[in-house]
Amino acid sequence: MKLTRRESKQRRHRRVRGKVQGSPERPRLAVFRSNEHIYAQVIDDTQHHTLVSASTVEPEVKSSLASGANCEASSQIGKLIAVRSLEKGITKVVFDRGGNLYHGRIKALAEAAREAGLDF
């Protein structure tokens, strides 16, 4: 029986999470993409603690965007998560794309975070 898109995404997500582990030296930059918004968190998996987060739901970000569901919004979140991470002294991360393909909004966020100074 053919897999649905949802099942394929869940399988990819489990596979990626099996390989990607955040540490205090290199925390995990986890990205979640919904139909309306995009969320990014820098997580230390050993402590189970979120160090930094940014999303298009935040009022200061939401007011400056026409939509939270496009590449422009994703790149703005990528820059914001990088700036907040660098303020906390985090320069190196491990990128966790979740079950999403590295394309479109996910790629825009990753490239913007790299340009803003995060190393991954």
Swiss-Prot record:
Coiled coil: none
Cysteine disulfide links: none
Biased composition (Basic residues): 8-18
Gene Ontology cellular component terms for the protein in this record: cytosolic large ribosomal subunit
UniProt entry tagged with the keyword rRNA-binding: yes
Region Disordered: start-end pairs: 1-26
Domain of life assignment: Bacteria
GO BP terms, alphabetized: translation
Any one GO molecular function term: structural constituent of ribosome
UniProt keyword annotations, A-Z: Ribonucleoprotein, Ribosomal protein, RNA-binding, rRNA-binding
Signal sequence, start to end: none
SUPFAM superfamilies, sorted: Translational machinery components (SSF53137)
Pfam family, one: Ribosomal_L18p
Keyword RNA-binding among UniProt keywords: yes
Family listed: Belongs to the universal ribosomal protein uL18 family.
Quaternary structure note: Part of the 50S ribosomal subunit; part of the 5S rRNA/L5/L18/L25 subcomplex. Contacts the 5S and 23S rRNAs.
Role played: This is one of the proteins that bind and probably mediate the attachment of the 5S RNA into the large ribosomal subunit, where it forms part of the central protuberance.
Name of the protein in its database record: Large ribosomal subunit protein uL18
Species whose genome carries this gene: Trichormus variabilis (strain ATCC 29413 / PCC 7937)
